[in-house]
Structure formats: C-alpha cells, structure tokens
From Swiss-Prot:
Keyword terms, alphabetized: Acyltransferase, Cytoplasm, Fatty acid biosynthesis, Fatty acid metabolism, Lipid biosynthesis, Lipid metabolism, Multifunctional enzyme, Transferase
Listed pathway(s): Lipid metabolism; fatty acid biosynthesis
GO-annotated molecular function: 3-oxoacyl-[acyl-carrier-protein] synthase activity; beta-ketoacyl-acyl-carrier-protein synthase III activity
Family: Belongs to the thiolase-like superfamily. FabH family.
Pfam families: ACP_syn_III (PF08545), ACP_syn_III_C (PF08541)
Protein name: Beta-ketoacyl-[acyl-carrier-protein] synthase III
Keyword Disulfide bond: no
Domain note: The last Arg residue of the ACP-binding site is essential for the weak association between ACP/AcpP and FabH.
A single GO cellular-component term on record: cytoplasm
InterPro entries assigned: ACP_syn_III_C, ACP_syn_III_N, FabH, Thiolase-like
Amino acid sequence: MNVGIKGFGAYAPEKIIDNAYFEQFLDTSDEWISKMTGIKERHWADDDQDTSDLAYEASLKAIADAGIQPEDIDMIIVATATGDMPFPTVANMLQERLGTGKVASMDQLAACSGFMYSMITAKQYVQSGDYHNILVVGADKLSKITDLTDRSTAVLFGDGAGAVIIGEVSDGRGIISYEMGSDGTGGKHLYLDKDTGKLKMNGREVFKFAVRIMGDASTRVVEKANLTSDDIDLFIPHQANIRIMESARERLGISKDKMSVSVNKYGNTSAASIPLSIDQELKNGKIKDDDTIVLVGFGGGLTWGAMTIKWGK
C-alpha cells in the first residue's frame, strides 16, 4: 500500500507584524532581524483566535482538496505545543466542529517537529489497514507564549496552521522513507518556562543541534529511499532561521534554488512551518505531481523528524 497526502490546506491569520513593530520597544532593527534570521514579517492571530480556530480553517481546505466529507475521516491527529487548553485537546475540538463523528482524536506534542511526527504516526495507522482518511494538522499560536521582552526570541515566532489528509495514494507516490528521533539531554535548551508560561531558548546550542540534525536526518532518509541529492526536486526544512536552513541545505548537498524559503513571510510557526511552506510552493507552481520532496523538522525536546515523499494523490 502506498500512503501519502490525499488533500492539503493551510491558513495564516490576517494580521501581519513587520520587523519595525519590534523597533518600538526592543534594541533591534529590521536590518539586524533580517540578517540574523531571514524574517521580514510574521502573522499573528487576534486575541479571540486560538489554535483550534487556525486548525479548523486549514482542515476545511484539506478536506475539500481531498474530495471527501468530514464523516469520511476516521482519525484526527493535531501537532501543537499551544493547545487552547490542556484538555480537551485541539483534536477533540476539531472532531466536534468538523462533524466527523466519534472518531479517535489526539494531540501530539513534539514542538516544531510535531508535523513530521504526526504524519509518520498517521502513515502507520493507514498502513495497518484499519484507517483510511486521517486528518493531520500542524497548528500553533506561538504569539501567546512569546516573551516580548526577550530580544533573542521575541522577533522569531508567528502563528499558522496546515493540514493534510493521509491515506492510500496511487502507485509510485506517497511517503517513501522517514525518520524521527529525540535527544532528551537537550531539553534544557528549548522549553516553556513553567513559571512565566513563555518560551525560553539557548540559541547557540539549538543552532548547533539544528544544523547537524536537519542535514544528517535529511541525508539518511534520502539514502534510505535509495536516492541521491540529485534526485531531490525540493527541500522543505522547518522554517526556523535562514542560517540554519542554509547550513542544512549545504550538508544535504542540494542547490539553493531547490530549497523552500517562507521564513521571510511567516517567521517560525512551529508545527505549521512545513505545511505553510508546502502551501507557498504549491501556489508558486514549484510542487508538481511525482516530484520528490524532502521534509525535515527539529524542535524542543530536542526532537527531529524527516521524510522523503513522492508528491501526488
């Protein structure tokens, strides 16, 4: 059985925050932010918009793109680190709001690696033969856990959501190879402070980890698929920082024109990062049926996930 993406959708809130916003209260500048991160702007949800609202909008698009009805979905997995509340989960809320019926629904927390973790998890369920249309959503409202007094992190994060329907696809298409892992010894470098409820990051250590693991994990899944870097049509890394992304691309050994860059428009949107990039490249015509694509993410935990996928239903 070939398991892959049957439907796709993404959503970014309307409100756009440019770098000039931060110049008003932080010792920073558009020039510095752009040079060090590649970020020019990011989308922030309104106060009355929560993660489940972002996830809902992306899910509607994915369901429509797959040509199915909500009642055809037999499981919901939401990757998020910013659920509306500890429970019920965002997936539970989506189940009710979409009208899928009483299907299994759960949130999966692997921070910025969450979308990779959830896609790989969904593949296993479909491969078992017991599930046929699994809604996987990566959604985060990072603006609510961003410390706006911390110059090193305040400028980095945005909000958004992306969704896919994972199920059986045509011969020769779908997920070819994958990897996920974690290193708990690095958890202290990227975490949510239990006292302040805000994100804390040791940027130097996270940078070193990210460059190494994104490049190495991408290389391993390409090799596992019996491919070479020359076979890759598009590389879509987690959009954390342009310098991390460029270093990972170089380690993988692909040309700059084959790497998706959306960090300039969205910032780091955690679990929504990779699907927002997919959305951009679909709209730009850079993703076509039968293209071979490498997806890779890293996040708090520390965690990582990667896959090669042959695009198409």
